[in-house]
Design a protein with these regions (language model features):
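N-terminal beta-strand motif that seeds the catalytic metal site of vicinal oxygen chelate
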Residues: 2-27, 79, 136-142
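Long, continuous compositionally biased terminal/linker segments
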Residues: 3-7, 52-91
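Core segments of cupin and vicinal oxygen chelate
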Residues: 17-60
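Vicinal oxygen chelate
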Residues: 20-25, 81-125
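Exposed loop/turn and edge beta-strand positions of beta-sandwich/beta-sheet ligand-binding modules
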Residues: 45, 75, 116
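Short glycine-/small-residue motifs
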Residues: 60, 131-132
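Short beta->alpha transition motifs characteristic of CBS
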Residues: 114-115, 121, 132-139
Length: 142
C-alpha cells in the first residue's frame, strides 16, 4: 500500500535508541536540538534519556551510554525528525550547529526526495546523521 499522506500512516516504529560516547554532552546536545521541535525529556534512568512530545509515552527517541565494543561512530544511521514548518527546520539546524554538530546539508528545498520536502541535515556529536524536515502541502504535524 502506498500512503498518499505520510502523516496518516500508522506508526510502525515505537522508539529509536542510539549509543553515545559522551553521555552528558550528548544529553545537552539533544536537549537543545529537540526542544526546537517541541520535544522534551520524558523519561530518564541511569545511562539513558528519552525525548518525545508531551502527550506521547513511551518517549520516541532515546540515547544511551555506549558500552565497550559498540560501534564508535555514525555507522550510517539516519534519523529524520518531523518539523511543523520551515522555521522549526531552521531552528533545529542552528541549535545543532551551535551545540557542536557538523553541517551535512543546510535548510532547503529538496525536490529529489518528494514534492514539498524542506529539510536540513547534520551529523551529531557521534557522527549520526539527523535531519529535520517538513513536507509542505500536507497537513501540519500536531
Amino acid at each position: 500500500m502506498v500512503w498518499s499522506d505520510p502523516l496518516a500512516m500508522p506508526a510502525f516504529v515505537d522508539h529509536v535508541s542510539i549509543p553515545v560516547a559522551d553521555f552528558e554532552r550528548s544529553a545537552a546536545f539533544y536537549d537543545a536540538v529537540l526542544a526546537t521541535l517541541g520535544l522534551r525529556r520524558r523519561k530518564q534512568r541511569e545511562g539513558a534519556i528519552g525525548w518525545g512530545p508531551d502527550d506521547v509515552l513511551p518517549p520516541i527517541f532515546w540515547i544511551h551510554a555506549r558500552e565497550p565494543g559498540h560501534a564508535t561512530s555514525g555507522i550510517g544511521l539516519h534519523i529524520g525528525f518531523r518539523a511543523k514548518d520551515r522555521t522549526e527546520v531552521h531552528a533545529f539546524h542552528e541549535a545543532a550547529l551551535r551545540m557542536g554538530a557538523t553541517d551535512a546539508g543546510a535548510p532547503g528545498v529538496r525536490p529529489q526526495y518528494t514534492a514539498g520536502f524542506y529539510g536540513c541535515f547534520v551529523l551529531d556529536l557521534d557522527g549520526f546523521k539527523i535531519e529535520a524536515l517538513v513536507r509542505e502541502g500536507l497537513p501540519p504535524r500536531d
